[in-house]
UniProtKB/Swiss-Prot annotation:
It is found in: Plastid, Chloroplast. InterPro entries: CCB3/YggT (IPR003425). One of its GO terms (cellular component) is chloroplast. The keyword GTP-binding does not apply. It comes from Guillardia theta (Cryptophyte). Keywords: Chloroplast, Plastid. It holds the Pfam family YGGT. Belongs to the ycf19 family. It comes from the Eukaryota. GO terms for biological process: chloroplast fission; nucleoid organization. This is Uncharacterized protein ycf19.
Length: 91
């Protein structure tokens, strides 16, 4: 039973790591104004990441016109990854 939990936790952490990379790409691309968010692959990227990022918009107001709310998203995702990793190691 322990092996199945280990596999489950490691798979979930792998998914979260991939999602974290997608978030990083999405946030990095917002610095390029010529990105067409309605063309592929950018449309798919925004559809995958925007629901998560929208949870944090409005919590922190933009500073000097820069939206820093994705930082909260990164921090929360890292905390979840750490918690899941610790649970997986202890089981």
């Amino acid at each position: 039973m322990s092996n199945s939990f280990t596999l489950l936790f490691s798979s979930f952490i792998g998914f979260l790591q991939i999602y974290l990379i997608l978030l990083l790409i999405r946030v990095s691309l917002t610095w390029f104004p010529n990105v067409n968010w309605y063309g592929q692959p950018f449309y798919s990227l925004s559809r995958i990441t925007d629901p998560y990022l929208k949870m944090f918009r409005g919590i922190v107001p933009p500073l000097i016109g820069i939206d820093i709310s994705p930082i909260l998203g990164f921090i929360l995702l890292q905390c979840i990854m750490q918690i899941v990793s610790n649970i997986g190691l202890s089981s």
